[in-house]
Structures are given as C-alpha cells and as structure tokens.
C-alpha cells in the first residue's frame, strides 16, 4: 500500500460515534468547503478533524484532493480539482476582495465578538469605492446570498438590502484568497472574466 494511504486503516479504530463524526466532517467539507472552529456548532467537528487529520488527508488523497488548514485562523478547507472550484462573476469577485480588506482592517480592532462584524452599508461603501460605481440592490442581494453560501460571511438580517444589517466576516475569507489569488482576481477583473475560487458548492 502507498505509505501515504496507510492512515486509511485508522477508520477501523473509530468508535460508532466517531465514525458518525467522520461522515459528518466529510459531508461538511465536500458540500460547504470549510469547517470553521469559531462557529459554535462546528467546534467539536473541527477538533475531531484536527485529531484525525492523517485519516482525512489519506481519504481525500484518494480523490486527488487535499485538505488545507490554518490552526491560527481555525479553518480547515477542502481543495479539489479545478473542475470543482466555484466560478465567481465580477461582482462576486469584487465582493471577496472587499471582504478581505474589511476583514484585515477589523481583525486589528479589539472586539468581544467571535468574528469581525460590519454593516451592509460598510460593505456597500467599500464596494462602490473599489468599483467606481454603485452596486444595484439586486446585485447586492445576490452577492451576499452567494458568499453566505460559500461560508465566507454570514448575514444576520433577513433583508439582505437593509443597510443597517450586520455581516459576520469568517476567517475563511483570507484563507480562501491569498496574495497570488488576489493578483489573479484583479487581473481577471481587468479583463472582465469570471474567476475560480475555493472548491466546493454553495449548498
């Protein structure tokens, strides 16, 4: 057996409850891309995955995929082949860049909240400044809905067009877009292209 796959045998050592956690973690990573430690309902799942990372690494290597993790951010991410990556339109790509900048700005502030928080109006102002135009209401709603599904943000308002609504910025934002990704996104924006982002779907 390939030495890298030896860890697959560890699945036999899991208890029934642990095996259920294993299946839940796989489903979460494949369907939602990220497991985020700071989300209360995912903390135990995050800890379980880190404890059993060799098993997960071996399992994902069988499908030519990988897990990427940053324990300082508390994020585990599924990285699949190119054909499994999300394709973002121009508004969505701009929004990711805006949220990345807002996340970096906000994380330097002292806060009692688990995640940096901004208002929808904060996002609109930054987005409009970056693009040199005004984001339309329909586009705003679509962008926030899409990126919420991608587990980059959470909108704490039933009305995505409410300027006073709050947006929680997840640590998956910087994790999913590194400096190379930022440069590629900016270049693609200049060419008017869609952009490939982190793997998974937005269910």
Where are these regions (language model features)?
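Eukaryotic partner-binding/assembly regions in large regulatory complexes
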Residues: 1-79
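Short alpha-helical segments that sit at the start of domains
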Residues: 9-16, 80-114
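Short acidic, hydrophobic short linear motifs in intrinsically disordered regions
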Residues: 34-44, 109-127
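Short amphipathic alpha-helical interaction segments
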Residues: 48-55, 133-149
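A short, conserved structural fragment
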Residues: 62-69, 148-161
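Accessory beta->alpha helical hairpin/"wing" motif in late/C-terminal subdomains of nucleic-acid enzymes
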Residues: 76, 80, 154-180
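Short acidic, glycine/proline-enriched loop segments that cap or flank alpha-helices
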Residues: 107-115, 131-135, 157
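Short, amphipathic alpha-helical interaction segments positioned at domain boundaries
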Residues: 169-203
């Amino acid at each position: 057996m390939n030495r890298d796959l030896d860890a697959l045998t560890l699945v036999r050592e899991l208890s029934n409850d642990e095996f259920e956690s294993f299946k839940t973690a796989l489903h979460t990573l494949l369907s939602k891309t990220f497991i985020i430690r700071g989300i209360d309902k995912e903390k135990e799942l995050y800890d379980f995955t880190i404890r059993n990372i060799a098993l997960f690494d071996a399992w994902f290597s069988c499908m030519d995929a990988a897990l990427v993790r940053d324990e300082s951010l508390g994020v585990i991410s599924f990285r699949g082949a190119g054909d499994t990556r999300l394709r973002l339109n121009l508004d969505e790509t701009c929004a990711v860049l805006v949220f990345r900048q807002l996340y970096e700005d906000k994380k330097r502030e002292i806060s009692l909240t688990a995640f940096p928080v901004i208002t929808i109006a904060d996002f609109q102002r930054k987005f409009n400044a970056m693009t040199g135009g005004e984001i339309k209401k329909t586009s705003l709603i679509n962008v926030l809905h899409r990126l919420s599904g991608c587990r980059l943000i959470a909108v704490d308002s039933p009305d995505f067009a409410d300027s006073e609504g709050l947006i929680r910025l997840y640590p998956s934002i910087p994790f999913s877009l590194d400096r190379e990704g930022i440069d590629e996104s900016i270049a693609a924006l200049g060419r008017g292209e869609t952009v490939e982002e982190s793997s998974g779907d937005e269910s």
